[in-house]
UniProtKB/Swiss-Prot annotation:
Role of this protein: Receptor for the natriuretic peptide hormones, binding with similar affinities atrial natriuretic peptide NPPA/ANP, brain natriuretic peptide NPPB/BNP, and C-type natriuretic peptide NPPC/CNP. May function as a clearance receptor for NPPA, NPPB and NPPC, regulating their local concentrations and effects. Acts as a regulator of osteoblast differentiation and bone growth by binding to its ligand osteocrin, thereby preventing binding between NPR3/NPR-C and natriuretic peptides, leading to increase cGMP production.
Keyword Hydrolase on entry: no
Gene: Npr3
Self-association and partners: Homodimer; disulfide-linked. Interacts with OSTN.
Prosegment residue ranges: 27-40
Protein name per Swiss-Prot or TrEMBL: Atrial natriuretic peptide receptor 3
Extracellular side: 41-478
Organism per entry: Mus musculus (Mouse)
Binding, chloride: S101, V130, C131
Reported phenotype of the disruption mutant: Half of the mice dies before weaning. They display reduced ability to concentrate urine, a lower blood pressure, and skeletal abnormalities. Despite a reduced half-life of NPPA in the circulation, the plasma levels of NPPA and NPPB are not affected.
Length: 536
């Protein structure tokens, strides 16, 4: 009996030790395959309310009709058998509301009205707006309300100040300042220090203005000189004035305008003999969209041959394009959805479409880490901090966000490599995270290895299509003008001399007559006064 009691006591002690050991190992972090799954299942299913603020007007490249298919594609991925099932608690669902932001205060009003209608209930995530003037007040309110805000817009330089009013903003598309960093690396590669900025500014969206503002600020910080010329391409374009400005400013010209306007400018400078290697022209293709000048010279008109020659001096800066099978599938689905909306165009997938898709993936990654750390979806500041300073796989390749919550920009430079056929290829790439620009070694440049090493201080003699003589002296018309001008000047001097002489004689005679008359009138007045006083 005593042995039975000892055996029972020993078994109890052994069982207690096993249980304690299990608890200790669990508290230290169980790394067995099923442990993470059980921890994730312990979290409650999440209902994520997303407010998308984008314009309904399809004239914008980031309209709801264009971007919504990309957002829904990403949501199907994270809610289905993709990223979301691995990262979020089972049963998590996204409830998305789409509101018209326009490009002004409507975005702010939509946010405030929605919160008021929900009796103070705020969304868990804001996607958009894109336009600077729409994004600014929404970003300030998001910071005040502790709401994470992810946008493929708000690209102007002012939004990089995240310490106060824009603290809850993450930009998932390269900001304009990133374009400036790319141009700076390009200039350092070619040993240039001066640039002329020529751009269209309609005073509304002002995309080109904000783009070259970013270039200007980066250049200014690094001691590079810039001068600027702006025009409104929606009105009559004074090409002669643009050419005169370029001739009187810098040798390296950075342009931003629509594709048709860039073509007109290049034709104009070509006709003035400015595409023979004395200038370097760069065109910025914004947003991976051909509407902002993709470097295409062909229009099927009578100017094609001339434009092909002109474009041999033009290089186009565009976002680096990567192709992977998933991106092709994504592009086809977006194209199908957009066409159902009645939109038929070439650029179904631009920078904004890609950016908002990747914004969903980035938010899910950040939310996963916040929930795992014991916080909730309402901890907007914690979530937004998890979106910064990280790299993840986007729909078109790797996406890297810097420590300030801004996406690094990877860019390519496209130029004409076959002047006979007019073929254009990528000749160089810039990798934003490394800050590195490199020319491609397998490309034949039509200008040779030293053509772009411009002498920025040398004065250029400009020619145009009209015949002219350059004999070193004055032309016949100039001499004739000088002689005629001298004769006219002499005639005017003689006429003035004789007029002045005649006028002086006339004045002297008139003065003599007036003095005689004044003497008579004085005597009469004095006699009248004396007679009056005598009578008095």
């Amino acid at each position: 009996m005593r042995s039975l009691l000892l055996f029972t006591f020993s078994a109890c002690v052994l069982l207690a030790r096993v249980l304690l050991a299990g608890g200790a190992s669990s508290g230290a972090g169980d790394t067995r395959p099923g442990s993470r799954r059980r921890a994730r299942e312990a979290l409650a299913a999440q209902k994520i309310e997303v407010l998308v603020l984008l314009p309904r007007d399809d004239s914008y490249l980031f309209s709801l009709a264009r971007v919504r298919p990309a957002i829904e594609y990403a949501l199907r991925s994270v809610e289905g058998n993709g990223t979301g099932r691995k990262l979020l608690p089972p049963g998590t669902r996204f409830q998305v509301a789409y509101e018209d932001s326009d490009c002004g205060n409507r975005a702010l009003f939509s946010l405030v009205d929605r919160v008021a209608a929900a009796r103070g209930a705020k969304p868990d995530l804001i996607l958009g707006p894109v336009c600077e003037y729409a994004a600014a007040p929404v970003a300030r309110l998001a910071s005040h309300w502790d709401l994470p805000m992810l946008s493929a817009g708000a690209l102007a330089a002012g939004f990089q100040h995240k310490d106060t009013e824009y603290s809850h903003l993450t930009r998932v598309a390269p900001a304009y300042a990133k374009m400036g960093e790319m141009m700076l690396a390009l200039f350092r590669h070619h040993h240039w220090s001066r640039a002329a900025l020529v751009y269209s500014d309609d005073k509304l969206e002002r995309n080109c203005y904000f783009t070259l503002e970013g270039v200007h600020e980066v250049f200014q910080e690094e001691g590079l000189h810039t001068s600027a010329y702006n025009f409104d391409e929606t009105k009559d374009l004074d090409l002669d004035d643009i050419v005169r400005y370029i001739q009187g400013s810098e040798r390296v010209v950075i342009m931003c305008a629509s594709g048709d306007t860039i073509r007109r400018i290049m034709l104009a400078v070509h006709r003035h003999g400015m595409t023979s290697g004395d200038y370097a022209f760069f065109n910025i293709e914004l947003f991976n969209s051909s509407s902002y000048g993709d470097g295409s010279w062909r229009r099927g008109d009578k100017h094609d041959s001339e434009a092909k020659q002109a474009y041999s001096s033009l290089q186009t800066v565009t976002l680096l394009r990567t192709v992977k099978p998933e991106f092709e599938k994504f592009s086809m689905e977006v194209k199908s959805s957009v066409e159902k909306q009645g939109l038929n165009e070439e650029d179904y997938v631009n920078m904004f479409v890609e950016g908002f898709h990747d914004a969903i993936l980035l938010y899910v990654l950040a939310l996963h880490e916040v929930l795992r750390a014991g916080y909730s979806k309402k901890d907007g500041g914690k979530i937004i901090q998890q979106t910064w300073n990280r790299t993840f796989e986007g729909i078109a390749g790797q996406v890297s966000i810097d420590a300030n919550g801004d996406r690094y920009g990877d860019f390519s430079v496209v130029a004409m490599t076959d002047t006979e056929a007019g073929t254009q290829e990528v000749i160089g790439d810039y990798f934003g995270k490394e800050g590195r620009f490199q020319m491609r070694s397998n490309v034949k440049y039509p200008w040779g290895p030293l053509k772009l090493r411009l002498d920025e201080t040398r004065i250029v003699e400009h020619t145009n299509s009209s015949p002219c003589k350059s004999s070193g002296g004055l032309e016949e018309s100039a001499v004739t003008g000088i002689v005629v001008g001298a004769l006219l000047g002499a005639g005017l001097l003689m006429a003035f001399y004789f007029f002045r002489k005649k006028y002086r004689i006339t004045i002297e005679r008139r003065n003599q007559q007036e003095e005689s008359n004044i003497g008579k009138h004085r005597e009469l007045r004095e006699d009248s006064i004396r007679s009056h006083f005598s009578v008095a």
